[in-house]
Amino acid sequence: MMNPVGFRFRPNDEEIVDHYLRPKNLDSDTSHVDEVISTVDICSFEPWDLPSKSMIKSRDGVWYFFSVKEMKYNRGDQQRRRTNSGFWKKTGKTMTVMRKRGNREKIGEKRVLVFKNRDGSKTDWVMHEYHATSLFPNQMMTYTVCKVEFKGEETEISSSSTGSEIEQIHSLIPLVNSSGGSEGSSFHSQELQNSSQSGVFANVQGESQIDDATTPIEEEWKTWLNNDGDEQRNIMFMQDHRSDYTPLKSLTGVFSDDSSDDNDSDLISPKTNSIGTSSTCASFASSNHQIDQTQHSPDSTVQLVSLTQEVSQGPGQVTVIREHKLGEESVKKKRASFVYRMIHRLVKKIHQCYSISRT
């Protein structure tokens, strides 16, 4: 329902109860109120998901909904207030809604609730819940009107909504078991970020280059999946002997990918590989870089190898970097695009350092 500029749907308490809530409960034809206020199960959605369910789109941080009263227990009048992310907590006393004209009788009640996270911390989401009182003993008031308000900034609504969508996507990704019964897990790729010391990457072989223009990412990955080969290789990197070379400073660190976003970090396994090094980025000069790939048939899941690197170096000695296979882990094909993206990012980082060293 599109609204003209300046239009506001702001009924007062009496109008909400008399002109919307009571007809919704008592009239046989409720189309005249349903086209203004949508009916939802409030506790089936998080507060930040409710604005998209509103019949009238508002940027003022106020939305109206009809909701069915759902009791927490079979006996008593305690309503269900809990959602997946938190719960609605009643604050203050129940207020009476009176008819301002005529006999000024009581026509309903209003309760104020605040949404709290699971840990009990308050949020900026507030709800005014309206209940119509029965004028006659046989009247059943099934519906309530929920006036949902957001007291924070508008940008916080969009960020909360995005976070909810991401959580939903992650919940849809199932854990898969391989044919051998081992549980599938994800592959974590890590990178080295240079700090105050400068480093040079040189002689990167053409096999590690990925041409996005010639081969689309999806097609190249499908080709990798459909390869029937069953080969596994451990690649040893040898660095040339330099008798005149002395390491600048001993460095020990963890390879981390600062460029990865929250989506990627949620998808991967919490297992990380730490890499101990005893030289700076400059010690990687004249090294040959190759990417080891583990291939499997399309009928089986893809196997990825987590690698740890042990580096031993001294003046006048040959540096040997061995990559040991820690374990073969199967992953679902739906996660293949994520793994490819992480490897692609690693290769791009190496190319950037290589380009800097050439200038």
From Swiss-Prot:
Question: Which Pfam family, an example, fits this chain?
Answer: NAM
Top-level taxon in the UniProt lineage: Eukaryota
Q: Where is it located?
A: Nucleus
Q: Which InterPro entries match?
A: NAC-dom, NAC_dom_sf
NAC domain span = 3-151
Gene Ontology CC: one annotated term: nucleus
In its UniProt record, a GO molecular function of this protein is: DNA-binding transcription factor activity
Which parts of this chain does the entry mark as a DNA-binding region?
A: 107-157
What keywords appear on the UniProt entry?
Answer: DNA-binding, Nucleus, Transcription, Transcription regulation
The text the record gives for the protein's domains is: The NAC domain includes a DNA-binding domain and a dimerization domain.
Q: What is this protein called?
A: NAC domain-containing protein 4
